[in-house]
């Protein structure tokens, strides 16, 4: 006995003041415990049960505990078992469960007292549907006419699917019968009511008669018959106390049942304890009554008291502050309580994000999530939840997660991977990879319909089950088609099987190639030849008698769009076709979580398919795996990394996550006043237990919700969603007023006070100290400052740049990432080496960040000054070191009058490294300068003056750093350096006036006159192809191949050059090449507009067209331009007969979001897509 007292004292010591008062309250009286979110209501309930058992010695079988779900009941049993361990208490005798499960146990024992026959059972939902359909089919005409008349009392009709005619619908009949049973009204009693509906009375009577014939009860009968039993007979005379969890979610008959449970053998109810929160009542569509707290006080036959719990153990104080501002907006029908108090606080408030276009919201949320996930050893994907008000919001979020390769799960919902079309396409791909999958064979044969019926499918299944022990399933199918295996299959069926086999074998041929490019064709062929494409574009939802041939393909079909999304996922890694093998392998490794490196390995199409199916394991239900050892290890690894949770707010009730995102905080979604919540939520958001699917209140207790009541319900739902968050909370919406047809307006709940309590970005990344504080609160260890792979400071900088760029692209290692597949979140420190395949912008940022010159800064953001719709920084700073870019002066951004596209010949206008070929066929590498101050590869580089096309123009060459010319901005000069024999480099520099003519030195340091290299200058300035350039040099110097490729002496060069006559070279003009006999001057100036005008400008990129290549400052802002400007920039001005492009007025918007909004408004009737070059 003393040991039990010690145990009880130990339990009490773990409670706070309010919790202790609730647990120790007089058990003979009534008690209301108002428990806000995170205040420990389950702890109070279990402690009170333990108090009744240990202190008052009440036997467990004399206590009833009701919960909202069976899952909650099982969790409570486990807690009590742990709390009372060693006390000698048998918790299994405790009567605990949902109202339906408790009523079921009572009726099993005492059902005969209300005329229930022996061996009755619960009827299946499918049986109910059959009964209802049969009733509707046989309904008399007068009842059918009455149901559709204006004199009806209850609506039982809905529009038919294939027309505008209104017909009696079984769903509405079932709903109305459920309401009658919830009020414990039998059919004969309802018919005697003077206000009854004739049609509903008819259906109710027939329905109940059919149940009696089958000796069955439905779930509503459980409550109704128990209520009738307890009002007649006191069968629960032993009950001494009743506890009800989630009291705010109870309806009228459940409140009455609570009083009947507690009555026991007494004329009045005995002890009752109810726990709940009126602010969390969100099941009005099931007619749960938030005012049941007040109703209990009105009906309670005994004295009762109220205790309010205010100590919150879940959320930070800033999250509680925002939720308190929200819930106190309700002025009527709510009892004020003390605000909740958190046990900790953080320096960063909840984040409110507003987007100008709906399609930007989901991807931006996912990128925010990735930055948080990147914090080492802090979060797993299990720590993130995205809560939606409506299920139609899930599609975009799911697509964004798939595109970013983030594993996810949907609580009690159907994910993209569960859809029929996705499963069908995956089955076909499985057969291409391994044709021995029996399930995939059967499913692909039967869907889409090809003339192979279920009976034939069953015969094929039996043959596969019987014969597949020694022979592959696909071979058995081939034997069936060729009649080697005799089955009673129609001729048409064999033809279908033969076509199916042919399709699989033909598509398998594409896997024999070593090239990955055929995978797109493979996907398209499977989609078309299988009949899925025709099914979704033409037949889906149409009858056979429709004229399918004349109809247009429905490209907006939801199933077809899902196939396109699957294809994008399937071909995601192929999008990096220009990447190195190393980059591809890293991307595959990141996508499939492969632990072993796969570098220097050529990936075949078959291996790509294997990696694709492995990557499906990112999604909790995307792939069905066998329980092999390797799969078990992979499963453990995936569970450790976790899954992002997607759930409706209803489904999230009672759960919590460290980080919560709530998208769609706008009118029409939150609040959603006129939505059919019953249709949207009830069937999928309830617990798997069927007994919870029928909780409708009685008509007497139910009133039609007014708009004000609906708004209060929506506010409570928003409150529940916010209080699921423990540390970080994000709210977001889309606000667009330009769309007149459907403007998007911020939620009315987002008042000025609420927005002031939030921030527009995550303040966690303002400083590394804030990040470390979060680590301390979560009892996690932050990465060391000298960590070789990860830097918190770099992550903070990337995130801030991400916010500055309006969350349009992920920024990683200071680089804007258009493709996030290859990002390794565990590594963000810049390494010394870079990939051979890189963009100019990436190379510039890398070299700038690694630069040893602190005075050279990278322009990350500046207020844009608009020039003809293009943007450039107002101020110019010294440019960073640049590896792959033209080296000329830095001027303004381009306008329509001046096109600064780099009009270099193909020898220099190539962004990646190229190789020139000598006459012997050997590779001669073309070298670019690593930076402006880099030295030549040779021990001594030679600097030479160029002679060229313009005899009246003069320029000088220098190895000094580029300096802007004060007068001649469009003039550039080129230096040609020899590194070794046969290896050379061309450099472009500003026109810089020198006091002395340049000198050239050989390896020995001897000076050369510029005239000695006149022939070489001619070759460089007049050649169009690299091979011609080498041949000209070779011919001009009169060197053999061997001499050219060997390290010849400078004396030999002088001798050869001295014997040559100086030749005059005429300026290069259109359609006429220079002749070798022309005279060459010592000095030359190359005019961008004269010499380079005839180059193939269509080989330039969009960035080169819209940004001045001479401007070496790095501008990270997106390119916005109209088609006219792009076309004019790419077109040669000298082409007189070119087709003109229709002019389009220059845009007047200042940023990308305004551009998108205006484009959307202008193309409101256009179903096409807006293309943005970024």
UniProtKB/Swiss-Prot annotation:
Residues 909-922, 935-955 have a biased composition (Polar residues). It comes from Saccharomyces cerevisiae (strain ATCC 204508 / S288c) (Baker's yeast). Its main location: nucleus. It comes from the Eukaryota. Residues 222-243 are annotated as: Leucine-zipper. ATP-dependent DNA helicase involved in DNA repair at least for UV-induced lesions. The polarity of the helicase activity was determined to be 3' to 5'. The keyword Endoplasmic reticulum does not apply. GO terms for molecular function: 3'-5' DNA helicase activity; ATP binding; ATP hydrolysis activity; DNA binding; enzyme activator activity. Keywords: ATP-binding, DNA damage, DNA repair, DNA-binding, Helicase, Hydrolase, Isomerase, Nucleotide-binding, Nucleus, Phosphoprotein. It catalyses: Couples ATP hydrolysis with the unwinding of duplex DNA by translocating in the 3'-5' direction; ATP + H2O = ADP + phosphate + H(+). GO terms for biological process: DNA protection; DNA recombinase disassembly; DNA repair; double-strand break repair via nonhomologous end joining; meiosis I; negative regulation of DNA recombination; negative regulation of double-strand break repair via homologous recombination; recombinational repair. Signal peptide: none annotated. Residues 14-316 form the UvrD-like helicase ATP-binding domain. Its EC number is 5.6.2.4. This is ATP-dependent DNA helicase SRS2. Belongs to the helicase family. UvrD subfamily. It is found in: Nucleus. GO terms for cellular component: nucleus. The gene is SRS2. Present with 5190 molecules/cell in log phase SD medium. InterPro entries: DExx_box_DNA_helicase_dom_sf (IPR013986), DNA_helicase_UvrD-like_C (IPR014017), DNA_helicase_UvrD/REP (IPR000212), P-loop_NTPase (IPR027417), UvrD-like_ATP-bd (IPR014016). It is an enzyme of class 5 (isomerase).
């Amino acid at each position: 006995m003393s040991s039990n007292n010690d145990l009880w004292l130990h339990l009490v010591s773990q409670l706070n003041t309010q919790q202790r008062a609730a647990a120790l309250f007089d058990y003979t009286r009534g008690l209301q415990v108002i428990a806000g979110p995170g205040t420990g209501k389950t702890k109070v309930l279990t402690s009170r049960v333990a108090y009744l058992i240990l202190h008052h010695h009440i036997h467990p079988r004399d206590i009833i505990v009701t919960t909202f779900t069976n899952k909650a009941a099982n969790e409570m049993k486990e807690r009590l078992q742990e709390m009372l361990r060693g006390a000698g208490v048998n918790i299994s005798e405790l009567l605990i469960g949902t109202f339906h499960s408790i009523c079921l146990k009572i009726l099993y024992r005492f059902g005969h007292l209300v005329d229930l026959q022996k061996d009755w059972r619960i009827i299946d939902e499918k049986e109910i549907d059959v009964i209802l359909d049969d009733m509707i089919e046989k309904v008399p005409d007068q009842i059918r006419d009455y149901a559709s008349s204006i004199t009806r009392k209850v609506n039982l009709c809905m529009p038919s699917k294939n027309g505008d005619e209104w017909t009696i619908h079984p769903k509405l009949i079932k709903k109305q019968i459920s309401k009658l049973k919830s009020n414990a009204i039998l059919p004969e009693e309802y018919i005697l009511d003077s206000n009854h509906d004739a049609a509903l009375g008819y259906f109710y009577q027939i329905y109940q008669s059919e149940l009696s014939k089958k000796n069955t009860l439905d779930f509503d009968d459980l409550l109704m018959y128990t209520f009738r039993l307890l009002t007649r007979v006191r069968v629960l005379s032993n009950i001494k106390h009743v506890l009800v969890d989630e009291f705010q979610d109870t309806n009228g008959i459940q409140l009455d049942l609570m009083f009947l449970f507690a009555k026991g053998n007494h004329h009045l109810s005995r002890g009752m304890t109810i726990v709940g929160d009126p602010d969390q009542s969100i099941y009005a569509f099931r007619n749960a009554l938030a005012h049941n707290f007040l109703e209990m006080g009105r009906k309670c036959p005994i004295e009762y008291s109220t205790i309010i719990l205010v100590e919150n153990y879940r959320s930070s104080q800033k999250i509680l502050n925002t939720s308190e501002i929200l819930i106190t907006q309700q002025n009527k029908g709510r009892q004020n309580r003390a605000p909740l108090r958190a046990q900790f606080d953080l320096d960063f408030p909840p984040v409110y994000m507003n987007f100008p276009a709906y399609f930007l919201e989901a991807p931006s949320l996912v990128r925010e999530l990735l930055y948080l996930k990147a914090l080492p050893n802090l979060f797993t994907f299990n720590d993130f939840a995205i809560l939606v008000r409506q299920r139609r919001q899930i599609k975009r979020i799911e697509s964004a997660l798939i595109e970013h390769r983030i594993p996810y799960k949907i609580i009690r919902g159907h994910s993209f991977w569960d859809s029929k079309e996705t499963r069908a396409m995956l089955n076909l791909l499985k057969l291409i990879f391994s044709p021995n999958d029996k399930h995939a064979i059967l499913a692909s044969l039967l869907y889409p319909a090809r003339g192979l019926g279920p009976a034939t499918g069953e015969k094929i299944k039996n043959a596969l089950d019987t014969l597949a022990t020694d022979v592959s399933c696909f071979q058995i199918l081939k034997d069936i088609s060729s009649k080697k295996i005799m089955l009673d299959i129609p001729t048409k069926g064999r033809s279908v099987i033969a076509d199916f086999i042919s399709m699989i074998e033909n598509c398998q041929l594409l896997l024999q190639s070593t090239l990955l490019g055929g995978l797109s064709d493979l996907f398209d062929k499977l989609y078309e030849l299988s009949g899925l494409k025709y099914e979704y574009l033409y037949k889906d939802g149409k009858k056979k008698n429709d004229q399918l041939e004349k109809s247009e393909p429905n490209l907006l079909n939801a199933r077809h769009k899902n196939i396109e999304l699957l294809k994008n996922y399937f071909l995601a890694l192929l999008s990096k076709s220009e990447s190195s093998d190393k980059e591809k392998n890293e991307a595959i490794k990141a996508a499939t979580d492969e632990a072993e490196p796969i570098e220097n390995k050529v990936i075949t199409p078959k291996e790509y398919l294997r990696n694709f199916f492995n990557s499906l394991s990112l999604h909790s239900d995307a792939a069905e795996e066998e329980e092999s050892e390797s799969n078990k290890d992979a499963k453990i690894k995936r569970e450790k990394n976790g899954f992002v949770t997607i759930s409706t707010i209803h489904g999230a009730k009672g759960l919590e996550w460290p980080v919560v995102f709530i998208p769609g905080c706008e009118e029409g979604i939150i609040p959603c006043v006129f939505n059919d919540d019953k249709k949207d939520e009830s069937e999928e958001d309830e617990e798997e237990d069927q007994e919870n699917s029928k909780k409708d209140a009685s008509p007497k207790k139910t009133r039609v919700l007014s708009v004000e009541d609906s708004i209060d319900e929506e506010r409570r739902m928003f409150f529940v969603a916010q209080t699921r968050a423990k540390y970080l909370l994000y709210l977001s919406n889309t606000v667009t007023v330009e769309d007149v047809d459907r403007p998007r307006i911020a939620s009315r709940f987002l008042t000025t006070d609420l927005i002031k309590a939030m921030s527009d970005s995550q303040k966690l990344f303002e400083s590394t100290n804030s990040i470390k504080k979060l680590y301390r609160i979560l009892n996690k260890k932050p990465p060391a400052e000298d960590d070789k792979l990860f830097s918190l400071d770099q992550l903070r900088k990337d995130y801030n740049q991400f916010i500055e760029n309006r969350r349009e692209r992920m920024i990683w290692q200071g680089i804007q990432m258009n493709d996030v597949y290859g990002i390794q979140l565990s590594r963000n420190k810049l390494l010394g080496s870079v990939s051979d395949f890189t963009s100019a912008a990436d190379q510039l940022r890398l070299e700038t960040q690694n630069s040893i010159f602190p005075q050279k800064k990278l322009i990350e953001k500046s207020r844009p000054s608009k020039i003809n719709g293009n943007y450039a920084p107002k101020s110019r700073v010294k440019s960073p070191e640049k590896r792959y870019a033209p080296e000329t002066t830095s001027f303004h951004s381009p306008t329509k009058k001046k096109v600064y596209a780099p009009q270099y010949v193909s020898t220099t206008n190539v962004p990646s490294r190229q190789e020139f070929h000598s006459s012997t066929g050997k590779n001669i590498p073309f070298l670019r300068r690593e930076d402006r101050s880099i030295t030549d590869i040779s021990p001594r580089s030679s600097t030479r003056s160029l002679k060229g096309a313009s005899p009246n123009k003069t320029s000088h060459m220098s190895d000094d750093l580029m300096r802007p010319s004060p007068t001649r901005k469009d003039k550039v000069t080129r230096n040609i350096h020899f590194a070794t024999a046969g290896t050379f480099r061309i450099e472009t520099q500003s026109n810089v006036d020198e006091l002395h003519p340049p000198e050239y030195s050989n390896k020995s340091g001897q000076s050369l006159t510029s005239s000695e290299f006149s022939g070489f200058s001619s070759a460089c300035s007049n050649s169009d192809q690299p091979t011609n350039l080498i041949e000209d040099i070779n011919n001009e110097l009169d060197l053999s191949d061997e001499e050219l490729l060997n390290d010849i002496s400078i004396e030999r060069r002088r001798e050869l050059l001295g014997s040559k006559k100086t030749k005059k070279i005429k300026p290069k003009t259109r359609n006429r090449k220079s002749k070798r006999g022309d005279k060459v001057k010592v000095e030359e100036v190359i005019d961008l507009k004269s010499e380079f005008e005839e180059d193939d400008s269509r080989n330039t990129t969009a960035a080169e067209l819209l940004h001045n290549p001479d401007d070496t400052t790095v501008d990270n802002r997106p390119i916005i331009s109209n088609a006219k400007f792009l076309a004019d920039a790419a077109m040669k001005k000298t082409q007189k007969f070119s087709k003109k492009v229709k002019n389009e007025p220059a845009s007047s918007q200042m940023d990308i979001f305004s551009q998108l909004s205006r484009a959307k408004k202008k193309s409101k009737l256009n179903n096409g897509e807006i293309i943005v070059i970024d």
